From Swiss-Prot:
Alphabetized GO MF terms: 4 iron, 4 sulfur cluster binding; iron ion binding; NADH dehydrogenase (ubiquinone) activity; NADH:ubiquinone reductase (non-electrogenic) activity; quinone binding
Top-level taxonomic group: Bacteria
Pfam families xrefs: Oxidored_q6
Function of the protein: NDH-1 shuttles electrons from NADH, via FMN and iron-sulfur (Fe-S) centers, to quinones in the respiratory chain. The immediate electron acceptor for the enzyme in this species is believed to be ubiquinone. Couples the redox reaction to proton translocation (for every two electrons transferred, four hydrogen ions are translocated across the cytoplasmic membrane), and thus conserves the redox energy in a proton gradient.
Binding of [4Fe-4S] cluster, residues: 37-38, 102, 132
The protein, known as: NADH-quinone oxidoreductase subunit B
Gene name as annotated: nuoB
Species, as recorded: Acidithiobacillus ferrooxidans (strain ATCC 23270 / DSM 14882 / CIP 104768 / NCIMB 8455)
C-alpha cells in the first residue's frame, strides 16, 4: 500500500513540522557573499551544467529576501563587520554555508595579519564545504547535507 492507497482514501496524515521543513528544503533562497576565487565555483554551480534551480535554490540579490548565505572566499578583518551586518538583515530561519578553505579557517592566508581565521568567528555556520577551491559538486553535496539538516530540525517545537 503505497501512495495510491493513501490517495484513494482522500487524505494524508503528517505533522506540521514535516510539512514546514519539507517546504523549506525545496525553496532555499541563497544570497551570495563571494569574496574570492570560490565565488567562481559557486557561479559554476548555478550555471547550466549543474543548475541549482533543480534543488529549489534561487539566488536572491537582497539579504532580506534570502534564508541562506554562502560565504565563499577569504574573509578579511575589514569585511567582517559587513558580513555580520548582512547576516543580521536576513530573516529567521537563516542558514550559513562556509565554502572553501579560506572561509573555513583562513586557508592559504591563515597566518596573515588581516585574515579572519574562519567565518564561524563572525557568524554561526551550519555546513562547511572543504576545498581550495571546492568544486561545484562539493557545493551541491554541502547544500544537500543542509537540506537533510533542515529536515531533522523541529520548527514548531522551538
Amino acid at each position: 500500500m503505497g501512495i495510491e492507497g493513501i490517495l484513494e482514501k482522500g487524505f494524508v496524515t503528517t505533522s506540521i513540522d514535516t510539512v514546514v521543513n519539507w517546504s523549506r528544503t525545496g525553496s532555499l533562497w541563497p544570497m551570495t557573499f563571494g569574496l574570492a576565487c570560490c565565488a567562481v565555483e559557486m557561479m559554476h554551480a548555478g550555471a547550466a551544467r549543474y543548475d541549482l534551480d533543480r534543488f529549489g535554490l534561487l539566488f536572491r540579490p537582497s539579504p532580506r529576501q534570502s534564508d541562506l548565505m554562502i560565504v565563499a572566499g577569504t574573509l578579511v578583518n575589514k569585511m567582517a563587520p559587513a558580513l555580520r551586518k548582512v547576516y543580521d538583515q536576513m530573516p529567521e530561519p537563516r542558514w550559513v554555508v562556509s565554502m572553501g578553505s579560506c572561509a573555513n579557517g583562513g586557508g592559504y592566508y591563515h597566518y596573515s595579519y588581516s585574515v579572519v581565521r574562519g567565518c564561524d568567528r563572525i557568524v554561526p555556520v551550519d555546513i562547511y564545504v572543504p576545498g581550495c577551491p571546492p568544486t561545484a559538486e562539493a557545493l551541491i553535496f554541502g547544500l544537500i547535507q543542509l537540506q537533510k539538516k533542515i529536515r531533522r530540525t523541529n520548527t514548531i517545537a522551538r
